[in-house]
């Protein structure tokens, strides 16, 4: 079975590496163009490109997978199936109809819930207790195709984005092998999604990162952990836009929203609209991430200061 893999970030790269190491015949790779990344804005290859080069798999990086160059590449490698994971761009009808066995996407949510670009962040932000991975046959509508395989996992109350993503990557790797083995022998039963139950996980915008301490402690906790460790939830402290990481506890006792009540080696207790949260780390502009205790000792922060939420960002 000839496989073309389509994906871009680390999530996709780990799945591709797993397929190749397990002997699957990946005949081609499509990934996004290299882009400037990090603080120095240095142009770096996508993680999927790195894996393709390592294993000498032919690859392309088109601006659009639906244009002539990409279609010619796909036809030249002749895939039986196309596997997509976190590619970041829409596949058109010509691509979807090209492989004889179809195109399948590995999506980190329990479809039809959380269709879209940011399912892991949104399930955490909304305080969901369960999530999972869905492999489905792609159709023109976003994340709306019939389901081939789905697995569910529970979410720890204080689990961060990084932690949950790692577990979903491992689950995706296991499921990709199971799915392709079944596809190889024609043992796939597709189940239509219940579109009436669909919810959406839109792309993250900068304003989504801002912590509103006037909300209850549970909501504040969920906001911070949804973007921990990247790109980091934001709040304003004086004139600084800072990042917050590592909520380790919540408390029902009241306090003023945003008020830094107490700092020790374990973190800072910060007031919310209902209750308090204990946050472990903070990052000031141009500085490394540090504990609140380090920030206090460095005279960057003291008890009695207040975090604010601003709309002018």
Curated annotation (Swiss-Prot):
GO molecular function annotations of the record: methionyl-tRNA formyltransferase activity
CDD domains assigned to the protein according to its UniProt record, in alphabetical order: FMT_core_Met-tRNA-FMT_N, Met_tRNA_FMT_C
Entry's EC annotation: 2.1.2.9
Binding site for (6S)-5,6,7,8-tetrahydrofolate: 109-112
Catalytic activity: L-methionyl-tRNA(fMet) + (6R)-10-formyltetrahydrofolate = N-formyl-L-methionyl-tRNA(fMet) + (6S)-5,6,7,8-tetrahydrofolate + H(+)
Keyword list, A-Z: Protein biosynthesis, Transferase
Any one annotated GO CC term: cytosol
Pfam families: Formyl_trans_C (PF02911), Formyl_trans_N (PF00551)
Claim: Protein biosynthesis is one of the keywords in the record: yes
InterPro entries assigned to the protein according to its UniProt record, in alphabetical order: Fmt, Formyl_trans_C, Formyl_transf_N, Formyl_transf_N_sf, Formyl_transferase-like_C_sf, Met-tRNA-FMT_C, Met-tRNA-FMT_N
Keyword hit for Nucleotidyltransferase: no
PANTHER family attached to this UniProt entry: METHIONYL-TRNA FORMYLTRANSFERASE (PTHR11138), METHIONYL-TRNA FORMYLTRANSFERASE, MITOCHONDRIAL (PTHR11138:SF5)
Function: Attaches a formyl group to the free amino group of methionyl-tRNA(fMet). The formyl group appears to play a dual role in the initiator identity of N-formylmethionyl-tRNA by promoting its recognition by IF2 and preventing the misappropriation of this tRNA by the elongation apparatus.
Similarity field: Belongs to the Fmt family.
Name the record gives this protein: Methionyl-tRNA formyltransferase
Species in which this protein is naturally found: Thermotoga petrophila (strain ATCC BAA-488 / DSM 13995 / JCM 10881 / RKU-1)
Gene behind the chain: fmt
